[in-house]
């Protein structure tokens, strides 16, 4: 077992308390990127101080954007450059482990005429699929090269004059959609993105708030149309808590006996709340309090209490984009439902930071879970009796936190290798866990 950054989690006890989860990762990335191409100042509060958004900030600084040193829990101000005023960087843009950084920057930089850019990442990111972004950008006139015929990083971009067009995306991916929309800001005419299913819409909401000419048409908002030629104006942004981070506590409170947790000021964007649909199907006991809307994003507090005899669930089809990041913790939940749960149509998880279907099946089996791994999902027999185990996050932040919650249900003490992976999206996860353990 890898002895670096091992965390020991003791099973038993309950979770009690009130907490705020870190700022939404998706909105944190977009506040930096859209603030950078706006005119004037953008004031940001509630930013997620973690590896991925900080990678975005570092890349934007190399492109000439005035972003101050970002400090934990402190607001800051960006001075935007406008849509077409990035400088050619003197060094390679390192996106770290962040697929969002790389894919959104690909869209942003493709139309920066006469300038050249190289994007790379860590070993994991450089194996993730980038062709789903480079191909539509090439249709718009983008000049993009990379390993394996432009489908893997490092990626080289030569800024070029782009033309608006209609693009159908093969998968419902907010990152792919966002890259095309950002490229559309610098393309001639109108750019239209047609998705096979709705994906998270933080980019559309924020672009509209900044003054972009953007419209959503068609069934379930699957056709997004953006026109170039409109300057964006800096805004004040308050970033809500990330529901994908809150999900670990929502499930933990539901499955750890005698638990009750209140999570304050969580983002409740309807393209992100698939986890609540599944919790309803399971029969979880939760209540949403203090609802409000800030900068177009709905927020609220969530009070969750333990329930015995949770029902099994099935996740498939159009709901997947609304809870794609929650599948690892839902796999843990399924182990404690009274019956067989199924996750399908989730092949996208095989090209995340890790192959999350394989990793979760492998690691949960070490606790004694009864899981069948399928090509596009998992079949999980519930009512498991977990024993202690030595498990490994395999450097995946969502796997690390899911295994921590699983360990709470195991008899004895479990060890999680490479537990520090959680810092990618939730730097204070282990501190918050300690506060909640009763």
Swiss-Prot record:
Catalytic activity: 3-phosphoshikimate + phosphoenolpyruvate = 5-O-(1-carboxyvinyl)-3-phosphoshikimate + phosphate
Residues that, per the record, bind phosphoenolpyruvate: 25, 99, 128, 175, 356, 398
Taxonomic superkingdom: Bacteria
GO molecular function: 3-phosphoshikimate 1-carboxyvinyltransferase activity
Catalytic site positions: 325
Pathway membership: Metabolic intermediate biosynthesis; chorismate biosynthesis; chorismate from D-erythrose 4-phosphate and phosphoenolpyruvate: step 6/7
Pfam families associated with the record: EPSP_synthase
CDD domains in the record: EPSP_synthase
EC number: 2.5.1.19
Location (main, coarse): cytoplasm
Positions with a binding annotation for 3-phosphoshikimate: 25-26, 30, 173, 175, 325, 352
UniProt keyword annotations, A-Z: Amino-acid biosynthesis, Aromatic amino acid biosynthesis, Cytoplasm, Transferase
NCBIfam families with a match to the protein in the record: aroA (TIGR01356)
Assembly and interaction partners: Monomer.
Entry's family note: Belongs to the EPSP synthase family.
Function: Catalyzes the transfer of the enolpyruvyl moiety of phosphoenolpyruvate (PEP) to the 5-hydroxyl of shikimate-3-phosphate (S3P) to produce enolpyruvyl shikimate-3-phosphate and inorganic phosphate.
Name by which UniProt lists this protein: 3-phosphoshikimate 1-carboxyvinyltransferase
Organism: Prochlorococcus marinus subsp. pastoris (strain CCMP1986 / NIES-2087 / MED4)
Upper taxonomic lineage: Bacteria, Bacillati, Cyanobacteriota, Cyanophyceae, Synechococcales
């Amino acid at each position: 077992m890898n002895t670096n950054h091992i965390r020991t989690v003791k099973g038993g006890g309950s979770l009690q308390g009130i907490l705020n989860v870190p700022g939404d990762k998706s909105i944190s990335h977009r506040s930096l990127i859209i603030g950078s191409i706006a005119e004037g100042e953008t004031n940001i509060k509630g930013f997620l101080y973690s590896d991925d958004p900080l990678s975005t900030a570092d890349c934007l600084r190399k492109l000439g954007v005035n972003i101050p040193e970002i400090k934990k829990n402190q607001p800051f101000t960006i001075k935007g450059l406008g849509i077409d005023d990035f400088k050619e960087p003197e060094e390679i843009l390192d996106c770290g482990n962040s697929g969002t950084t790389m894919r959104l920057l690909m869209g942003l930089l493709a139309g920066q005429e006469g300038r050249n850019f190289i994007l790379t990442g860590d070993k994991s990111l450089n194996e993730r699929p980038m062709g789903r972004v480079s191909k539509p950008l090439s249709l718009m006139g983008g000049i993009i090269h990379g390993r394996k015929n432009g489908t893997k990083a490092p990626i080289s971009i030569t800024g070029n004059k782009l033309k608006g067009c209609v693009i159908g995306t093969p998968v419902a991916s907010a990152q792919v959609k966002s890259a095309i929309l950002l490229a559309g800001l610098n393309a001639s005419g109108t750019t239209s993105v047609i998705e096979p299913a709705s994906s998270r819409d933080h980019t559309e909401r924020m672009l509209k708030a900044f003054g972009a000419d953007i419209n959503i048409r068609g069934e379930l908002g699957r056709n997004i149309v953006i026109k170039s030629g409109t300057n964006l104006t800096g805004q004040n942004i308050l970033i809500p808590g990330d529901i994908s981070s809150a999900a670990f506590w929502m499930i933990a409170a539901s499955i750890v006996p005698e638990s009750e947790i209140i999570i304050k000021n969580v983002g409740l964007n309807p393209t992100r709340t698939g986890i609540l649909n599944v919790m309803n199907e399971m029969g979880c006991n939760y209540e949403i309090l203090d609802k409000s809307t800030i900068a177009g994003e709905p927020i609220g507090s969530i009070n969750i209490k333990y329930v015995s005899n949770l029902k099994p669930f099935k996740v498939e089809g159009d709901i997947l984009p609304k809870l794609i990041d929650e599948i690892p913790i839902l796999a843990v939940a399924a182990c404690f439902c009274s019956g067989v749960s199924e996750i399908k149509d989730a092949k996208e998880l095989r090209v995340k930071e890790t192959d999350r279907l394989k990793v979760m099946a492998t690691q949960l089996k070490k606790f004694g879970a009864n899981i069948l791994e399928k090509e596009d999902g998992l079949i999980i027999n519930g009512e498991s009796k977990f024993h202690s185990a030595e498990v490994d996050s395999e450097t995946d932040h969502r796997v690390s936190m899911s295994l921590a919650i699983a360990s709470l249900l195991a008899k004895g003490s479990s060890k999680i290798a490479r537990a520090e992976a959680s810092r990618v999206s939730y730097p204070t996860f282990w501190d918050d866990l300690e506060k909640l353990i009763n």
